[in-house]
C-alpha cells in the first residue's frame, strides 16, 4: 500500500519566481502572421477627410506610409503584441527617411514629433511579426517596399494625376495598380476620395501577394471603396 507523504511547507519566494518569469517572458509575443499589408495613404485625402486632425504643413506630395500590418487568411489579425518601446534611431539618415516617407500627418513638420506615431505602429503591428530587437528592420522593410512599389509613379504613368478635377473609375485605378505589381491590391476610399492603397506581401516582405477580398464592389456598405468613381485630389 502506497504511503501518503506528509505536506511540506512551501517557500513563498519559490512561488514568486514561478509567477514572475512567465510575465517577463511574455511581454512580447511573436504571433502567427500569414502576410503583411503595406498601407499607403494619400496625404491630401487624409487632410480633406480629417481636416481638424491634419496639422502637417506643407503636405507631402507623395503617398506616405500609414503602416506595415501583419494579417492572416483564416484568423484575426494579431495586434498589440508588446508593451516595449523600440529604440530611437541612431542613424540620422534613417530618421530623415522616416520623416519623409512615414510622417505623422496629425503633427507639424518638426523633427521628432512623429516618434509617438511610429511607437504606436511598432507596438500595435510591427511587434507581432518582428522580434523585439528587430524594430529597425521592421521600419526599414516598410521604407524599402514603399520605394520599390512606388504607387504614385504607377498612377501618373497611366494618366491618374493627383489634382485632376474629374473623378477616376475605381475599377480602372484598381486594374492599373494590379497590372503594375502583378497582384491585387486593396483600395480604401472615404467621402469619394482615394484615401489609401494597400499592397500585400509575404510574411518576409520579399514578394507581393494577392490581397484577400480586394476587388472593388461599388456601393456595398462594407466594401473599403464603395464608389464607382473616386477623386484623387
Swiss-Prot record:
Glycosylated residue positions: 62, 72
Entry annotated with the keyword Disulfide bond: yes
UniProtKB keywords: Disulfide bond, Endonuclease, Glycoprotein, Hydrolase, Lyase, Nuclease, Secreted, Signal
GO molecular function annotations of the record: ribonuclease T2 activity; RNA binding
EC number: 4.6.1.19
Secretion signal span: 1-31
Protein name listed in UniProt: Ribonuclease S-4
Originating species: Antirrhinum hispanicum
Amino acid at each position: 500500500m502506497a504511503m501518503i507523504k506528509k505536506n511540506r511547507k512551501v517557500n513563498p519566494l519559490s512561488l514568486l519566481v514561478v509567477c514572475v518569469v512567465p510575465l517577463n517572458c511574455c511581454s512580447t509575443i511573436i504571433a502567427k502572421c500569414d502576410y503583411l499589408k503595406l498601407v499607403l495613404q494619400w496625404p491630401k485625402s487624409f487632410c480633406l477627410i480629417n481636416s481638424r486632425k491634419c496639422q502637417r504643413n506643407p503636405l507631402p506630395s507623395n503617398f506616405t506610409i500609414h503602416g506595415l500590418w501583419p494579417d492572416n487568411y483564416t484568423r484575426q489579425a494579431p495586434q498589440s503584441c508588446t508593451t516595449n518601446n523600440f529604440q530611437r534611431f541612431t542613424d540620422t539618415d534613417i530618421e530623415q527617411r522616416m520623416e519623409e516617407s512615414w510622417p505623422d500627418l496629425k503633427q507639424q513638420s518638426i523633427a521628432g514629433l512623429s516618434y509617438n506615431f511610429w511607437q504606436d505602429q511598432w507596438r500595435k503591428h510591427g511587434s507581432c511579426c518582428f522580434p523585439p530587437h528587430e524594430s529597425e528592420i521592421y521600419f526599414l522593410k516598410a521604407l524599402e517596399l514603399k520605394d520599390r512599389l512606388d504607387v504614385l509613379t504607377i498612377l501618373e504613368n497611366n494618366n491618374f494625376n493627383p489634382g485632376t478635377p474629374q473623378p477616376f473609375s475605381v475599377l480602372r485605378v484598381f486594374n492599373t495598380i494590379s497590372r503594375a505589381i502583378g497582384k491585387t491590391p486593396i483600395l480604401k476610399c472615404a467621402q469619394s476620395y482615394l484615401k489609401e492603397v494597400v499592397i500585400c506581401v509575404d510574411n518576409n516582405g520579399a514578394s507581393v501577394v494577392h490581397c484577400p477580398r480586394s476587388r472593388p464592389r461599388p456601393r456595398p456598405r462594407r466594401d473599403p471603396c464603395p464608389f464607382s468613381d473616386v477623386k484623387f485630389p
